[in-house]
């Protein structure tokens, strides 16, 4: 298992006090202004309200300061959350795009909006299609099939569009890499407008207009728009109105696309998503209304987290498992009964996606169990016959979470061609790694954190070897980035009101994460199963205060902690309504034994490097090399109780954090000579002593020989 350190951000206490006063003062003035009293407040009233506001806003001010926002004016502007949306005409080629589209409308030419099969592509397609239709355009829309067509505009699609007599194609959320396709369209006399947000190649497609904020020569100030965001700007430009006026018409779709595509929720995106989520809550689109009803959000506030975990997966599932057209039909649907049917169909498809994903994760885990040496690879490459290509990217993400290593999952079809999807970890450029093996591949693409590839099955062993050779040269020791904690808290000082104030920082997402709090020296007072044991709920007590916190994905029987253990917890905090009124609740991100520090992550990484055969410096070897007595201490500790074999942090805490590397080496050595084994009980592995006849020689352990330089 990979462990990551926790990094508690440095806090400027003076800045926190200044921010607390500034925020509280503004809140107090607003309360006085909106009060029902006809008389001005007395000084005593004002001061009492100010004092109460300071108590409620101190936590919020602490988060702002921890994230480097120490100027009161900047903080108040951020909390207002209404940054101006810039003029869409600042996007390079936007004028050309508008001119050609308006010409097509005037001449009654048929326009085809060509999108993508993910949430961003579906919402961008619906957004532009409906707007053009409202302008009186003759317009159609088209989405590619993930399996049949692959990503982006294809020559077959262009030929089909041409054969149907359409004269203009407008891409959304794709097209920036369609160099050959653009030339093919031109050869047929079909005009092309590209609107995209992906990073361009050195050469742009030859089109009437190429609108992409990430063009090297783009003149717009904000580069973080998604495909739906660019389509939103195009609609505003076509109407000739400020983009703020468009929010009431299509802000909901732009917000869903932005959140689902994991775009930074800063700058213009923050304004767009805040407004779009408000509109989504009261949308009059039958399709979105039905989807909200289906996921239990009808009539409730909708958050970015709701979009990420409830709405987006259902829309995405259509493109992964079936056809994205089903999702597009739902978004565009105007009949309530039909919308309800389509929304339920998306739920069914999503359940199928989850089941398929779980099957492949299980198959991948069985493969790792059969070949444990794969876990020593710097880059884990797994493949299987006819694994569903629509979910292998999600499976790769799940395995990255579990292993802390870059993972590529490949599905091999009946013709012996493999389609792979990979996910990386911070600090490892997966695209560069794959590019170093280009001669083994049919196709590849992506970026540092995610990539895709096509490869012949017979080349997979060589690909595994070559990628790991590259990783050994470029990243000999792969450290897991730390978990960033915003604030350390005392439960007795945290109130429902202070946590509720944190909503002013929302929407949360990329580059604006949900605040992470460090709860130190908390006692585990209760462990309860949730959802038939899929998750667990903990009662944590710190001093005289306690909180219930859910740990999603942690089965109670897999929890390596027991009642009475003292832990440090990394938590998100929220407020929920109960029969007793508003209550605080937590969501566990990670637990550590109380006081455990950076040495665990650092020394674990060194031992993993040693297992992979990476040469270590003498000082590094000395840090993790146990003497015989230390190995015996570990063995004797295993005699005292059944220790968890997959999360060793409690054992590290018991034997001493600075002994982490030596403890890991000792466990490996004991296992290699057959004195201990990791045995599964109820889906959880524990260390057990192995009965042996005769003595075992620890010096025979390969890991100890490696440390000795043999």
Where does each model-flagged region fall?
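Short amphipathic alpha-helical segments and helix-helix/interface helices
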Residues: 158, 182-183, 667
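Acidic, two-metal ion nucleic-acid-processing modules in DNA metabolism proteins
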Residues: 133, 138, 270-313, 317-365, ...
């Amino acid at each position: 298992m990979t462990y990551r350190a926790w990094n508690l951000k440095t806090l400027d206490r003076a800045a926190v006090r200044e921010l607390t006063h500034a925020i509280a003062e503004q809140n107090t003035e607003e309360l006085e202004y909106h009060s029902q009293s006809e008389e001005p407040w007395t000084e005593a009233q004002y001061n009492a309200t100010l004092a109460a506001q300071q108590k409620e806003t101190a936590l919020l001010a602490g988060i702002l300061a921890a994230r480097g926002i120490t100027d009161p004016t900047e903080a108040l502007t951020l909390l207002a959350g209404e940054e101006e949306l810039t003029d869409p005409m600042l996007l390079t080629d936007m004028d050309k795009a508008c001119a050609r589209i308006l010409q097509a409308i005037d001449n009654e030419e048929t326009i085809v909006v060509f999108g993508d099969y993910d949430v961003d592509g579906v919402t961008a397609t619906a957004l532009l299609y409906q707007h053009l239709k409202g302008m009186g355009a003759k317009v159609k829309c088209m989405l590619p099939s993930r399996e049949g067509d692959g990503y982006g505009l294809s020559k077959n699609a262009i030929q089909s569009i041409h054969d149907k007599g359409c004269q203009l194609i407008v891409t959304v959320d794709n097209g920036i890499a369609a160099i050959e396709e653009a030339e093919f369209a031109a050869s047929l006399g079909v005009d092309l407008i590209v609107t995209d947000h992906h990073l361009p190649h050195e050469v742009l497609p030859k089109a009437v207009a190429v609108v992409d904020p990430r063009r090297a020569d783009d003149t717009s100030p904000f580069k973080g728009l998604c495909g739906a965001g660019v389509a939103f700007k195009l609609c505003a430009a076509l109407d000739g109105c400020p983009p703020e006026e468009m929010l009431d018409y299509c802000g909901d779709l732009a917000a869903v696309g932005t959140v689902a595509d994991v775009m930074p929720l800063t700058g213009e995106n923050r304004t767009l998503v805040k407004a779009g989520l408000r509109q989504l809550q009261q949308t009059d689109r039958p399709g979105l209304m039905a989807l909200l009803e289906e996921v239990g959000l009808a009539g409730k506030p909708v958050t970015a987290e709701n979009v990420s975990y409830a709405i987006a997966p259902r829309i995405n599932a259509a493109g992964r498992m079936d056809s994205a057209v089903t999702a597009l039909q739902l978004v565009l649907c105007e009949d309530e009964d039909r919308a309800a049917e389509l929304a339920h169909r998306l739920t069914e498809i999503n359940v199928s996606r989850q089941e398929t994903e779980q099957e492949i994760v299980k198959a991948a885990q069985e493969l790792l169990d059969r070949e444990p040496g794969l876990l020593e690879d710097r880059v884990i490459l797994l493949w299987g016959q006819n694994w569903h290509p629509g979910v292998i990217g999600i499976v790769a993400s799940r395995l990255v979470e579990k292993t802390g290593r870059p993972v590529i999952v490949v599905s091999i079809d009946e013709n012996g061609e493999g389609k792979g999807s990979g996910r990386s970890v911070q600090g490892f450029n997966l695209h560069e790694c794959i590019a170093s093996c280009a001669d083994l591949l049919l196709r590849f693409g992506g970026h540092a954190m995610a990539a895709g590839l096509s490869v012949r099955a017979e080349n997979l062993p060589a690909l595994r070897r070559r990628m790991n050779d590259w990783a050994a040269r470029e990243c000999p020791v792969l450290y897991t980035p730390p978990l960033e904690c915003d604030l350390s808290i005392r439960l007795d000082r945290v109130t429902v009101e202070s946590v509720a104030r944190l909503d002013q920082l929302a929407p949360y997402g990329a580059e604006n994460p949900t605040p992470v709090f460090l709860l130190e020296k908390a006692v585990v007072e209760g462990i309860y199963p949730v959802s038939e044991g899929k998750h667990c709920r903990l009662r944590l007590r710190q001093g005289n205060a306690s909180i219930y916190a859910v740990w999603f994905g942690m089965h109670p029987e897999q929890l390596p902690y027991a009642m009475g253990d003292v832990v440090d917890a990394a938590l998100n905090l929220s407020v929920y309504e109960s029969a007793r009124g508003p209550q605080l609740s937590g969501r566990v991100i990670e637990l550590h034994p109380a006081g455990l520090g950076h040495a665990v992550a650092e020394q674990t990484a060194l031992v993993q490097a040693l297992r992979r055969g990476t040469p270590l410096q003498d000082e590094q070897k000395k840090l993790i090399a146990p003497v015989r007595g230390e190995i015996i201490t570990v063995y004797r500790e295993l005699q005292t109780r059944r220790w968890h074999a997959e999360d060793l942090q409690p054992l590290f805490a018991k034997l001493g954090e600075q002994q982490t590397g030596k403890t890991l080496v000792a466990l490996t050595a004991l296992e290699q000579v057959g004195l201990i084994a990791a045995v599964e009980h109820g889906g959880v592995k524990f260390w057990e002593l192995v009965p042996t006849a005769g003595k075992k020689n620890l010096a025979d352990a390969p890991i100890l020989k490696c440390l000795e330089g043999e």
